Structures are given as structure tokens and as C-alpha cells.
Regions:
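A short, N-terminal "cap"/entry segment at the start of jelly-roll beta-barrel domains
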Residues: 1-38, 114-166, 259-263, 268-299
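Ordered, small/hydrophobic-rich secondary-structure cores
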Residues: 11-93
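Glycine- and acidic-residue-biased ligand/ion/polar-headgroup-sensing regions
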Residues: 49-51, 58-74, 176-204, 209
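Ligand-binding loop in jelly-roll beta-barrel domains
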Residues: 28, 78-79, 89-118, 188, ...
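Histidine-centered metal-chelating micro-motifs
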Residues: 52-55, 73-74, 81, 85, ...
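C-terminal functional regions that serve as terminal interaction/effector modules
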Residues: 189-196, 201-285
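Short, flexible domain-boundary/linker segments around small modular repeats
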Residues: 37-50, 163-178
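Long, low-complexity, intrinsically disordered segments
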Residues: 291-317
Length: 317
């Protein structure tokens, strides 16, 4: 998720553009909210024009789709506002159409947008991870269940949780007159979009309906407030931990140092092992197909984590 810090951005300020990538049918428009220029992963506001039709097919990148207005039909099932779809890479979904049009958010997590017409899954696809739900109608609001927690008045609906990274996708709301007076930063990337309503943040000002941010790790944000409340959709790439404090002048390096110091005290044995191990490629026996060479930062005893290995050629069907 190597995208630059973007905050604030309001998609109402830019026009839609026609989707012209190979494979995509005509009738889809987009507004680019954030983009990883290395691998093409991106977040977009999308518009399906009335009469849009897409045949059965799959993407080489997993993606998430959230419908904000209008409706789409997948197979014979109609999905209206509040509908969330997670499609793993290589999983083919049924024909998609939008007779009257729809707007939504779409997230391509690990690669550029792609569409390949197909009525069957890729041989390595994980269909068991496919998920579709109408979060407005079929999920309850809950208080945040992570600690340290946000102030009372902020509630969530968890749409997807990654058991390996602990990254998650969630709806969230702030009640009218919500406020929180401290400052926070996280060890993860965090992005959010305001479906409705405005909130205020000390560093970045007001974020209205259509407002968006992509926030990289260790960026101070807060205090927070919302006069009338908001409804938003948020995502993280790894576990969300709230490092709260009250000093608005700390920088990224100081926040990193503080987080590392906390790790030393919270997980001392793990910290010592990570720093003393030579060729540091820990293998998770539950995820043996994801050895650290391919999907995680690591080092070879020299402490240099930003390096690359030659990629093995992948066969595509």
C-alpha cells in the first residue's frame, strides 16, 4: 500500500472519467481517490451508467465494492445502497448489471484494476473468501472493540477482517456532537470516505460528504468533532492500534520511536528474536503459500528492509 498521504480530498471537486482499461465494458466511470504507482492498487469512486452490463468474469486483483446509491444486479440478486461485495483474486462472479445506474466505492487492494470474462474461477482462486452483504439492512452497529478505544459515540460495522494482517474494512458513524480531544496515530495505513456528513479535525479542517483521505502510518490526527454526525467507510491494511497522546508537535520519526518503544515493552521476546535472527524470513505454518519474500518487508541481517527479490514468472490462464 505504497501510496502518498492524501488528506483532505473531496471527490465532488473533480469530474468522472470514462473507464477505458482493457476488458472493462463501456458504461463505467470513475474518480481516482488514491493510487499506488508501483503496483496499480487504487481506490475509486465509480459510476455505473443506466443500462450498464458486465458479463461473468474475474479480476487478477482482489477487490471490494460498496454501493452508495442506486443498485446493481449480480446474477439474479439485486444489491442496493449499503451493499458490500468482497471478491478474492481469480474468483469469477456472475453477470453484473445496473438497469437504473449506481454509484459506489471500489478498492483494488494488491494490483491494478482488471477484468477477464470467464464463467469459472482461476485454479488458485479462494472462493471460500467471497462475501456479499447489505450492511445497512443486515448488520448491527457495535461499539469499537479495539483498545485503546475511540470516545463514546463512534460505532462500527465490520464488513471484512483479514485474519492474517488484521486489516479490516468497516462502516463507521459518529453521533451528533461527537468529540474526542486527544491526538492519535497508527502503525497501519488508513483510508476513509464520507458517505454522508461532515467532521472536523485539528490538523486538516473540515471533511464533508464526498471527503476522502489516505493516511500513511504515524501521521498525527485529532482532536476530532462532528456537529451533526457522519456516516463513512474506512479501511486499514494491518491492525489498527490507537497510539493516543496530547502533543500536536511530534513528527513521524518521534511517533515511530514511541511505537517501537511500546513494542519492546509489550512483546519483549518477539522484539529480541526479530532483531537477533539472521536471514529474517519467518514462516507462518498456517500461510505457507505466503513466504515473506513475496509479501512482507524483511531483512538479511543488515537491517535494510526496503529491497526486492526477482519475481518468479506466474502463469496466467
Amino acid at each position: 500500500m505504497a501510496r502518498p498521504h492524501i488528506e483532505p480530498f473531496v471527490d465532488r471537486d473533480v469530474p468522472f472519467r470514462k473507464m477505458t482499461l482493457p476488458g472493462f465494458p463501456k458504461g463505467m466511470q470513475y474518480k481516482m481517490l488514491s493510487l499506488d504507482t508501483d503496483d496499480g492498487a487504487c481506490t475509486m469512486t465509480v459510476l455505473f451508467e443506466p443500462g450498464y452490463k458486465q458479463p461473468p468474469g474475474m479480476s487478477y486483483s482482489e477487490y471490494e465494492l460498496f454501493i452508495m446509491s442506486g443498485s446493481i444486479t449480480i446474477g439474479e440478486k439485486v444489491w442496493g445502497p449499503g451493499s458490500y461485495v468482497f471478491v478474492p483474486a481469480g474468483v469469477a462472479i456472475e453477470a453484473l448489471s445496473s438497469p437504473r445506474g449506481a454509484t459506489g466505492l471500489i478498492f483494488y487492494n494488491y494490483g491494478e484494476p482488471s477484468f477477464v470474462e470467464s464463467d469459472s474461477d482461476h485454479k488458485h482462486a479462494e472462493r471460500n473468501r467471497l462475501a456479499m452483504v447489505n450492511a445497512y439492512e443486515n448488520m448491527h452497529w457495535t461499539s469499537t472493540n479495539f483498545f485503546p478505544a475511540t470516545a463514546p459515540g463512534c460505532m462500527v460495522k465490520v464488513l471484512r477482517f483479514d485474519p492474517r494482517t488484521h486489516g479490516f474494512t468497516f462502516l463507521y458513524c459518529m453521533t451528533p456532537n461527537f468529540w474526542q480531544d486527544n491526538i492519535s496515530y497508527h502503525d497501519c495505513c488508513e483510508e476513509a470516505y464520507h458517505i454522508w456528513g461532515s467532521s472536523w479535525m485539528m490538523q486538516f479542517g473540515d471533511l464533508p460528504t464526498g471527503g476522502y483521505f489516505w493516511r500513511t502510518p504515524y501521521i498525527n490526527h485529532g482532536a476530532f468533532a462532528s456537529k451533526l454526525g457522519i456516516l463513512g467507510l474506512g479501511r486499514t491494511d494491518t491492525q489498527l492500534y490507537n497510539h493516543f497522546h496530547f502533543n500536536p508537535w511530534t513528527n513521524i520519526e518521534e511517533n515511530q520511536e514511541r511505537a517501537a518503544s511500546r513494542l519492546i515493552h509489550r512483546n519483549p521476546e518477539l522484539y529480541k528474536w526479530v532483531n537477533s535472527h539472521g536471514h529474517n524470513h519467518p514462516i507462518d505454518f498456517e500461510f505457507d503459500h505466503g513466504h515473506a519474500h513475496g509479501d512482507m518487508a524483511h531483512h538479511h541481517g543488515d537491517g535494510v528492509v526496503e529491497h526486492k527479490h526477482k519475481k518468479k514468472k506466474r502463469s496466467r490462464r
